[in-house]
From Swiss-Prot:
Biological process (GO), any one: sporulation resulting in formation of a cellular spore
Main EC class the enzyme belongs to: transferase
Functional summary from the UniProt entry: Phosphorylates the sporulation-regulatory protein spo0A under biofilm growth conditions. Also able to weakly phosphorylate spo0F.
Species this chain originates from: Bacillus subtilis (strain 168)
Gene Ontology MF terms in the entry: ATP binding; phosphorelay sensor kinase activity
SMART domains the UniProt entry points to: HATPase_c (SM00387), HisKA (SM00388), PAS (SM00091)
DNA repair is among the record's keywords: no
Residues of the PAS domain: 29-99, 150-220, 271-342, 391-462
Phosphohistidine modifications at: H526
Keywords from the named record: ATP-binding, Kinase, Nucleotide-binding, Phosphoprotein, Repeat, Sporulation, Transferase, Two-component regulatory system
Domain spans labelled Histidine kinase: 523-729
The protein's name in its UniProt record: Sporulation kinase E
Nucleotide-binding among keywords: yes
Enzyme Commission number(s): 2.7.13.3
Amino acid sequence: METLGVQTNSELREELNRLKEENARLKKELNQHQVIVNNTLDAIFICDNEMRIVQANEATERMLQVDSEDLKKRSVLDFLFSIPKDELNLSVKKFFKKGFLWKEVPIRLDCGATKYIEFLAKRGIGEDFFFVVMRDISSKKILEREFSMNEQLFKDLFDRAVDGIVLFDKDGGFIDANLSFCKSFEINHNELSHLSLYEFIDSGSRKDFDNIWKALNRKGKAKGELPVKLRSGVQKLFEFTITSNIISGFYMSIMRDITEKRSMELQLFKSEERFREIFENAMDAIIIWSNDGRIVKANQSACKIFELPMNLLLKRKLCDFLVDSQQKYSITKRKYAKYGEIREELLFQMGNGQFKELEFTSKRTILENQHLTILRNVSDRKRMEKELRESELKFRKVFNGSMDGNVLFDNQYRIIDANPLASHILGLSHEEIKQHSLLDIISAYEIENLASPARQINFDEMDNEIPFLLSSGDNRKLEFSFKRNIIQNMNLAIFKDVTERKELEERLRKSDTLHVVGELAAGIAHEIRNPMTALKGFIQLLKGSVEGDYALYFNVITSELKRIESIITEFLILAKPQAIMYEEKHVTQIMRDTIDLLNAQANLSNVQMQLDLIDDIPPIYCEPNQLKQVFINILKNAIEVMPDGGNIFVTIKALDQDHVLISLKDEGIGMTEDKLKRLGEPFYTTKERGTGLGLMVSYKIIEEHQGEIMVESEEGKGTVFHITLPVRQNAEERRNDE
């Protein structure tokens, strides 16, 4: 038993020693591994299953720029937040499922810097930790990106270059070309492999091309101009550079089509020739001068304008001829300095001392450090313009100050201009009248007849009249005459408003007629009244003394005598009105009394009279019996023009605060325009047995009341009398009338 125990202790000691040796060896190996891990360039660290960093080497600290103590507080996910969350979660799941993950990912450091790393994570079976190896591949990524960019840049340059780029072999066979080359050579890209550069070299240029090829083989590059002939027969000229052994021993050529350039150069040469011809033979003075103002070149016309020979002119400065005292000179100078071009007119003093007004245009930098000025003598034109302006001013004063309306119009009758009086006469503004045609005022027939050579109008005898309706609705009467072609395509129409004059003449004519009628009426009335009194007396005596049934005869005689008596009364009213007493009365009551008086006569003719009163009608200052006489005259006429019956509409309303309007409308046969104009004239009547005195008396009564009668009529539709009366009459005017 003791022996067994001793053996066991001995074995234990041996085992312990062995374990110590093994432990020392493992520590040694661990230290060696630790040294290797710490000195490796890759970041190596261990994480638990919560992704927290447990242990890391020094390379990890350097790569992540975090010390070891802080690293142990961090999760590896803290550095992977630049990866989209969904993608990161998917990668973590895949790692825990397979135990292995390799990925190239960007990481974001605490300082904000970004690095690209190669990330390797691996976990052992059944282990509750995993290790991660990270390698910084930022430089590699930068190189890859630069290479990719350079490759893409070359491809873009190759594909998008304006110049043609072609790769070909030592025999001239095409390998590849960009779109510009194919377009210039009029070939498709898929044809390139079957074509050679030699096929496009014209036989006359083969020797030159061989020399280019020799220079290329000798120097490794060549440049120059190469004429080619396309398959379509079109000839082009190309500017080229060729480099040998550019890619896999091939040649690369950059070719630019300069056919148009050469053509433009030729055109430019011809243009310069033409400019020289124009410069030397121009009627205007042309001067080229330098920045210091010195004249560099001038044509012969410049010598003539500046009154100097060429050799002296080329020794002068352009500013030497300008008159400094003129105000426009300094303004023109500043404008030219600012804009580099100008068009102006200035006063110049010529070489012989003469002053001339010159119109000029100047432009800077048409040539290097040079300026171009073209000058024209406008002294005569200026003088003519001044005379023309003075003439225009005189014409405008006469035109605008004329006592008649003047209108200028072209051969299509479009109004070009009108003076203020024409605008006033026609009731249109100056702008409005210019938008009209003369045909809007006068018919084409009248224009052609009045302005024809066979009938020249004397402006002092303007006896041609036309009616004209203003936009306000007023009717005017105009006298007019014309003058054709006062200048080319310009005619003159002269208007004079004679409305007031014609109305005055008409009033004078009627006044004279009324005066004569009044005197005649007074004489007739006095001469007839006395015999009439005797006749009435004897008829009454005779009626009482004669036996038999003669009542019908006496009634007829008495009725006719009463009619003669009413005519005598109207004569006396025309001759000299009796003393009139004006008083305030309601015109509505006067009208009602009149309608009541005439109702019996109206009923006999089957005529209905309707009175319509609108709003409150104020009383007016009037002589009621006279107004009643007016209403009787008009209503009786209305009844008589409707023998088959009809309606009379009477409307009374306040026109405004100071006037009352009475309208009497019938449904008779109406009147023509000519008849309307003569209403109120003595002895003018439209009735078979009328005297024409009733309406004349009515007009006179309304005139004495300071009112107005207006008549509207249309044949077949009836007539309307509009009577306007003032609420208060002007006492001064009434005294003058009396």
